Amino acid sequence: MAKFTKSLVLCLLLAAFVGAFGAELSEADKANVVNEIAANIQREILKGVKSSETTLTMFLKEMQLKGLPTCGETCFGGTCNTPGCSCSSWPICTRNGLPKRAGVKSSETTLTMFLKEMQLKGLPTCGETCFGGTCNTPGCTCDPWPICTRDGLPSAAA
């Protein structure tokens, strides 16, 4: 958010500069300045999106390694290539046993970091992951999996 604010202030300062000295600039120069401002703002926004994608990818990869029931592959010929996975709920490979507890704290930290970042960006997350296709938080659904999301817009109390 701080980067966006800085970009906005920079944009306003450049716009004020162009407005103040606009009479001395040609139309081509004005267009170049405006295009440069737009490109800078777009770059800042895309940096934030890339950060969110990286955090989500890291979270999902860690969850797969720490014991979420899916193995990250589909059944092929009735078998799964990932060790510890089986094709019992075709077409998705699932783990044979309960998740190991060794990495739970690390996974919770990653989940908390991901959810905090998403909430700061305004996504309606509920603060839990889907378990058995359901969410325990009232008003939340398991769509899109694996993050529970609110059915509608978040209420002011949430």
Swiss-Prot record:
Alphabetical UniProt keywords: Cytolysis, Disulfide bond, Hemolysis, Knottin, Plant defense, Repeat, Signal
Superkingdom of origin organism: Eukaryota
PTM annotation: Kalata-B3 and kalata-B6 are cyclic peptides.
Numbered residues of crosslink Cyclopeptide (Gly-Asp): 122-151
Signal peptide from the UniProt entry: 1-22
Pfam short name (any one): Cyclotide
Cross-link entry Cyclopeptide (Gly-Asn), positions: 67-96
Entry's Gene Ontology BP terms: defense response; killing of cells of another organism
Residue positions assigned to the propeptide: 23-66, 97-121, 152-158
SUPFAM superfamilies per record: Cyclotides
The UniProt record lists the keyword Cytoplasm: no
Keyword Signal part of the UniProt annotation: yes
Disulfide feature: 71-85, 75-87, 80-93, 126-140, 130-142, 135-148
Purpose: Probably participates in a plant defense mechanism. Has hemolytic activity.
Notes concerning its domains: The presence of a 'disulfide through disulfide knot' structurally defines this protein as a knottin.
Name of the featured protein: Kalata-B3/B6
Organism: Oldenlandia affinis
Organism taxonomic ancestry: Eukaryota, Viridiplantae, Streptophyta, Embryophyta, Tracheophyta
Gene name of the record: OAK2
